[in-house]
Amino acid sequence: MVQLSELASALNQTESKGVFSKHPKGFGFVHPEDATDKTNDIYIGKNDTKFAMDGDKVTVKVTYPKTEKRGASGQITKINERAVVDTVGTYRSLSNRQVKALGYKGRIELYNDRISDTLYIKQPLSGVQEEDVVSLKITQYPTNTKTFEGKITGIIGHKGEVGLDILEVLCAMKIPQEFSSETLAEAEAFSEKLTDSDLQDREDYRNEITYTIDGDDSKDLDDAIHVKKLSNWHFELGVHIADVSHYVTEGSSLDEEAYSRATSVYVTDRVVPMLPVKLSNNLCSLNEAQERLTMSCLMEIDDKGKIVSYKISPSVIKTTYRMTYNNVNKMIHQGQEGHREALENFFKITDSIKVAVELHEILETMRKDRGMIEFDESEAKIILDEKGHPIEIVKRDRDTAERMIESFMLMANETVALDFQKKKLPSLYRVHDNPKEKSFAKLMEAAANAGFSLNSDSHQAINFFADEIKGTSSEKALTYQLRHTMSTAVYSEKNTKHFGLAATNYTHFTSPIRRYPDLIIHRLLHLYPSDHSNHTKDEWKERLPEIASHSSDMEHRAVVTERIIDAMKKAEYMSERIGEVYTGTITGLQKFGIFVALDNTVEGLIRVPNLHTGTTEELEFDEEASIFKGKKSETVYQIGQEIKIRVIAANKRKGTVDFEQIAPE
């Protein structure tokens, strides 16, 4: 007869397949294939990984099942598929003694410390020097009896070259740096002069006063606007977007490259474009006084922000002014320095800007009334010197001009999505799910503990809550938590709405120079008027899911890359400020410490031993409430709380900064 203990043991020894995420310290977690969230992840101890690396697909034997108090743990029994076959790192030569003892000429300090500590090289590539950054192909994975080996396939850069640190990250993240000769040849073959054939069947807006509004340094100008009042006192908003699809045709080398990249990547010292510069900064960029092919969305909007009518069509424009956010803000704000000069310099659009601001305010009110959830966000720009060293972090809040352009682009994106939806034509949508259930439940509890009402994740409830906490001592903490309950927006062939915008229909139409989904939208806008047969619709229904999935993945890769480089440069900046004192805001808590963000947007960690409360009492971590509290006193650390810190360490390579708390007096 089978004993209950034996049965339980047998049930515990179940196998599961999934993806291994490795921590730099060696342990990790397997995310099962059929799991929907991280609560089902299986912990793998350092000695139970079977030398699996980050991202490997593995089979795991569950040795301890999940309980109410702790997650499951197990042992990796098989590596089914390797995630990494090539990588990048820094070359280090070995001493003669080491060469003789180990049989290798050099080792590689890998960029990704989640793969493995050290990779050995039998024969370095000709020309490789100490501390060069190199690309590698893995030739042997580590086991109990085998060493981790690789072969150098190329030199990315030599020690001391400006920008090499950023280039290493781009290569590690597999962000392509060069275009193929075929792709470049296709781009160069286009004439700079528009022909009669190019202009055929296009609306002519060359006599319309149109202008672009972008950052001071922007070169890929893919959107222009015109705004005016009509005789019935309604507004006419024209959003004119570079017609990239005219040049990047389906099946071309340009198209294949654009699909592969799916997005431009914007990092501290450079832009890695989706398209060759001949297109991104020239033929498709709506440069001042240049005739450019566009796709236009003209909207008639009433004084409540409602669209009365619209027209979407291929077009041609001639940009009147290349405006910057700074100059437009000077035109808008009477008391701002340079206001009078800006009005004089850009006199042709003075009336249009006034009307644009009026329309923007109407649209903002309309979106707030329907429930759009908006957070005040600041951007930080890291200023580098000529050697690529960070010398300043400039924080910039979004002013009227920035919000106005965003408002108009949102309007165009919604209108184009509505057009596809009304005509029941296959398309791509930008969708955003409701808040994450578990995170939102924690927020509701935190709100209740602070004496505020948040009883659902409806737009009305969230906006009421946001207004209720405004100006209170809890605003920072609860707003930060609210922001982190939000899901990530993705691309989809299904129109499942956009929660954050409170929009029933939404797509990406306005940036085809830097986003592949927008290019697809333009392609479909060209296609459907002449061919909306069932065959064509069926073909696109089949193709769009893969385009959506790939575009979302590449967007995620770009975002992660940008964050890594941002963190690296901020750590480098703070490495010269060891010992300096700042006031920061607590942004997260874990049992090992507290994350703190400074006003300059640098984020660092105060480890528990460096939490100086001013007393000798011990702190305990309440995981459910996500707070640290004193065991005896009322000392509490929670998200949103201000805290005075001192910088004690910074690691550029890892992109980390360490703080210690300065004890309250």
UniProtKB/Swiss-Prot annotation:
Chief location of this protein within or outside the cell: cytoplasm
PROSITE patterns per UniProt: RIBONUCLEASE_II (PS01175), S1 (PS50126)
EC number of this enzyme: 3.1.13.1
Compartments (UniProt record): Cytoplasm
A single GO molecular function term of this UniProt record: exoribonuclease II activity
Annotated ranges, domain RNB: 202-528
The keyword Lipid biosynthesis is assigned to this record: no
Family, as annotated: Belongs to the RNR ribonuclease family. RNase R subfamily.
Name recorded for this polypeptide: Ribonuclease R 2
Source species of the chain: Lactococcus lactis subsp. lactis (strain IL1403)
